[in-house]
Amino acid sequence: MKIGVPKEIKPQENRIGLTPESVKTLVSEGHEVIVENNGGFEAGFENEQYTNAGAKIANSAADIFNDAEIIVKVKEPQKVEVDMIRENQIVYTYLHLAAAKELTEGLIKSKSINIAYETVTDDNGRLPLLAPMSAVAGRMSVQAGAHCLEKNQKGRGLLLGGAPGVDGGTVVILGGGVVGENAAVIATGMQAKVHIVDKSEARLKQLIKKREKCYEDRRT
């Protein structure tokens, strides 16, 4: 099949749908992969890395949407992309349609086939493609929060991890899922006092066991 990888155009989105290593795997399976010119540049991948992996380079997103049977993206299609999606074209990406009425209507009108990464579920009811995004979000939340506590950001001037003779901050995390767990990892690493609130007692016990194992591993 012809698989197209356009450059992401959503503001502040610098990732790309496929890495050169993923392209190499798909090409070895007999697929044709087309990557937009400099599509992976902001993610640290050069055109040459994609061509070495077996991909072809397209001059524009329009060429990709016009030629590919499958479109592989990271974030939801923007208006200009929706207008290029063809009937029966398959689109893989994070869609988050619940709060995007216009996008939902546009995709329905295009009669395309859309697979949202965030709703892909494994046999155990977990969301394996959403978990990595949630992990990043959790870790970034503490990093961003610590930055906002600085005085020059109109914060309280609090150093989250404290300093010799100065108490650190207290972090309260609502929810002990993937986001919450990863937020706790970073906050704990910064030596803040961390409290997690979750409605599931079983999940809280699981997190406590993970913490205890982490301490044991450090001692050994």
Specify the residue positions occupied by each region the protein language model found.
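Glycine/serine-rich phosphate-binding loop and adjoining beta1-alpha1 elements at the start
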Residues: 2, 8, 79-169
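An N-terminal-biased, well-structured beta-alpha scaffold segment characteristic
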Residues: 2-106, 110
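Glycine-rich phosphate/diphosphate-binding loop of Rossmann-like nucleotide-binding domains
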Residues: 6-7, 11-42, 154-220
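Generic secondary-structure signature for well-ordered alpha-helical cores
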Residues: 28-32, 55-56, 70-73, 109-113, ...
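Short beta->alpha connector loops at strand-helix junctions that form conserved
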Residues: 36-37, 60-61, 94-96, 116-121, ...
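Short low-complexity, flexible loop/linker segments enriched in glycine and/or proline
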Residues: 48-52, 74, 129-133, 209-213, ...
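Short, basic, helix/turn surface patches
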Residues: 58-70, 138-151, 220
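Residue-level detector of alpha-helix initiation sites
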Residues: 76, 136, 177-179
